[in-house]
């Protein structure tokens, strides 16, 4: 039955952030209840003696990856860009404790792109990341699709979460 199947798992976490150099109220530290939908695709396993028979991925295995790479890192944290001056980032750490510094402006759009890289690199062979949907509020979200990013993956080199164009090196 070699059908390609998509499977999706939902995760939630609480996170605060501040947008460096932003001209609106989101420049202030504020928080959201995020919801992340992770969609993978692949062929269900066809090995009758394997306990994972019939699965694209065991949802508990996907949960372990996302929990370790996303939820445990970002839940109940304050996320700020390294672009803030060191005095401010030190202050965030002193005031809030769990502060995560990232190499980008921590918008919903940039977060979902970062999360895609963190998840995709850990998926088992034969299973691919199809898409992510990150809700920042009940009515606002950003989406990442593998199909939309195939061309850019060959023209960009990734260094952590900071992307540099080949012609900029």
Which residues make up each language-model segment?
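Charge-rich, low-complexity N-terminal segments
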Residues: 1-169
């Amino acid at each position: 039955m070699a059908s390609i199947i998509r499977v999706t798992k939902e995760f939630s976490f609480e996170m605060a952030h501040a947008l460096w150099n932003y001209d609106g109220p989101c420049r202030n530290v504020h928080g959201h209840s995020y919801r992340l939908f992770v969609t993978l695709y692949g062929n269900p396993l066809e090995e009758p003696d394997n306990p994972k028979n019939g699965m694209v991925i065991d949802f508990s295995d996907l949960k372990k990856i996302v929990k370790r790479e996303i939820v445990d890192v970002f839940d109940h944290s304050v996320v700020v860009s390294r672009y803030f001056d060191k005095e401010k980032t030190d202050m965030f750490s002193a005031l809030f404790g769990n502060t995560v510094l990232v190499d980008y402006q921590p918008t919903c759009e940039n977060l979902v792109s970062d999360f895609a890289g963190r998840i995709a690199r850990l998926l088992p062979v034969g299973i691919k990341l199809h898409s992510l949907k990150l809700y920042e509020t009940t009515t606002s979200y950003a989406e990442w699709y593998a199909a939309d990013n195939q061309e850019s993956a060959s023209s960009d080199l990734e260094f952590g979460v900071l992307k540099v164009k080949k012609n900029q090196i």
